[in-house]
Amino acid sequence: MRIQVLAALAGLVALPVMRPEAQRPVSDRRRWMDSTTQTSDDPQRLPVQNVPRGPDGSLVLLGGRLFDGTGAPTREATLIIVRNKVTAVLPKGARNFPNGARIIDVTGKTIMPGLIDLHTHLDYREPGEDGVSGNDVSRATLRGVERLRFFVESGITSVRDVGSHGVVPFRLKEWVSANRIPGPRVFPSGTLITGTGGHGDLGDGSFLAGAIRLAEGADDWRKAVRENFVMGADVIKIASHFSKAEVEAAVDEAHDLGLKVTCDCETFYIDRAVAAGVDMIEHPLPRSDSAIALMAQRGTQADPTLVPYIIIFDERGGYWGSSSRRFTFSKEANLNVLRRMKQAGIKLGVGTDLVTNWYRYMPAPYITELEQFVAVGYTVPEALVAATRTNAELLDMGDKLGTLTPGKLADVLVVNGRPDVNLQDLAKVDMVIRDGNVVVQDGRVWVPRHVPVVAPRPYADSTSGKARPKS
């Protein structure tokens, strides 16, 4: 060995290069199903009854400028939606529409895929709410309902919730899916998993009770992952602090269950998380060049979320980090992290991480986030592709969302402007369609009229409990 080292130093022998192991793949549940099996429209891919979904009939968006999210140039086209799917994209002038279709003229407007936000906290408590009121489940749910409206009126048709109060994001997901409340699709992570003294365990106590799962030791980290899986998680969210064994256990368990892992961490914890095989790193927190190189080599993705820190810098004049993290940074440093990741070829998604009452600023924060992408070298169309197709891929939903191509779910945004030229035009929301349902018209949430259900007869008298006579 000593001779080999001496020879290598002399340039005579090349020592083998130690490389990280290949990224451990996420288990694909679809491989065990027949190709005709219909599955749930989320990363869980649960088999569901093969019945038509979405509203009856068909919808035609006629004469608009189509930005389809694939990276192709914007063109004039007509979009055909049948029930909850895009079935055709017709060239300008074509009129072969389905019989009885509802036709909406969108001439001069831009048709594009609904936007996706990869980093939300739907029920994070408001300023001024104390620990008792802020942690009340009913209040948390109502906050979530309100914020879903802010999102969908901003053209966002899918949100990934990466840390909220217990069951709240799961119930919100159910009610949106059933069209009982207006909003975007919800992809919840469940509780944030961290170690004692980690992110959310120290600080000002602003995290909701039930939003954090403290785990100690590798076996407990595995158990915490399984707990979120049982709740119905679409992704697993972890945060520093963690040991090498703990993060490896979490990733191993999540990938076995078919779920990706995203990590909120900083400095050397990023190196540790990437080496363990996490799928994504959140935020622009400090990291070394070697960590960025390792992310690129392992295919680790990133959701930079620059906009919340911009808000903090603008409102408070600076950021000092939480007591559990011990670092400082600036707008320039954050932007440089984004620039370095882009230059390294890391796949980047778009998320806002809006907390407290910042949701009320929408859609401006989302547009600001996209502007940071442009600032580091993306073209405007490339930034919009990141917000649609790339975000869908990072959700593990690239086969169903993110582009307006035949076979994809009909999540559509219609804008009064040219957002592929000027990002500020994203604020001019005209119509939003989610799962084939029109949920925003003329820029406002549209709630269909309640259609009374015919009560069966005879039925019980509400006061006496006796059956009423037939009329």
Question: For each predicted feature, which ranges?
Answer:
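Divalent metal-dependent hydrolysis catalytic cores, especially in the metallo-beta-lactamase
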Residues: 144-169, 184-191, 231-241, 260, ...
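Active-site core of metal-dependent hydrolases
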Residues: 238-333, 354-358, 377-379, 393-395, ...
